[in-house]
């Protein structure tokens, strides 16, 4: 049963309210084989060619061994381990018609974008998710609404990573994160900002990160 009271149970509202139950059900509907194939397509289990060594993102060495694990993985828990740099690369696809860009540490003048993986999402999927992320910030009920800046096309998604030893561990901490993307404007290049803060359990969860992100964006846009 969903924990959020909203009328239309679809992807857009699930994104707006960050509804874990919706995504758990979606994972079960998709099934473990398609879930695995799509995560592999995004680069899970692969090392990133980066300036320094990075751990590969993973959904567990044995795959999805139960429906419970599959459902939990649908909203980023279970055995999901996502490298933040890899996460940033995945989100670049929503600014590049479904193609992931290769991340690098130092900005240099380049003749063209360096591509990590082409066409990981269809253009239809990109448009659908972009509109949902836009509403995460614009909608007054959105978990990212505190980052809304009037007249600026910001899109985002909040998240919370639980750090605990077991399902019954009540003393574990939480990492709050917020990914924000902004298409290119007349005077600013396209931007993606991935903000992560440790130990947000008693500081408002990912909402703490959203407020910090708005300050950064306002400074950038001056």
Where is each model-derived feature located?
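Beta-lactam-recognizing serine transpeptidase/beta-lactamase-like catalytic domain environment
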Residues: 1-195, 205
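Short, gly/Ser/Thr-rich active-site loops of penicillin-recognizing serine hydrolases
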Residues: 113-117, 210-222
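A short acidic/glycine-rich loop-to-helix N-cap element
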Residues: 197-211
């Amino acid at each position: 049963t969903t924990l959020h009271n909203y009328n239309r149970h679809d992807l857009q509202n699930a994104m707006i309210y960050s509804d874990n139950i919706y995504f758990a059900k979606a994972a079960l509907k998709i099934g473990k084989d398609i879930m695995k194939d799509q995560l592999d397509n995004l680069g899970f289990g692969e090392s990133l060619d980066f300036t320094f060594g990075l751990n590969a993102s993973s959904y567990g060495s044995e795959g999805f061994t139960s429906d419970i694990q599959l459902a939990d993985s649908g909203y980023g828990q279970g055995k999901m381990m996502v490298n933040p740099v890899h996460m940033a690369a995945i989100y670049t696809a929503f600014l590049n018609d479904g193609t992931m860009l290769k991340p690098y540490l130092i900005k240099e003048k380049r003749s063209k974008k360096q591509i990590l993986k082409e066409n990981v999402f269809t253009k239809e999927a990109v448009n659908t998710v972009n509109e949902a992320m836009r509403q995460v910030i614009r909608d007054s009920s959105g978990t990212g609404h505190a980052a809304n800046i009037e007249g600026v096309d910001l899109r985002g998604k909040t998240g919370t990573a639980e750090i605990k030893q077991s399902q019954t561990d009540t003393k574990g901490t939480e990492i709050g994160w917020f990914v924000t993307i902004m298409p290119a404007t007349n005077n600013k290049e396209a931007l993606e900002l991935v903000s992560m803060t440790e130990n947000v359990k008693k500081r408002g969860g990912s909402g703490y990160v959203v407020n910090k992100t708005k300050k950064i964006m306002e400074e950038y846009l001056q």
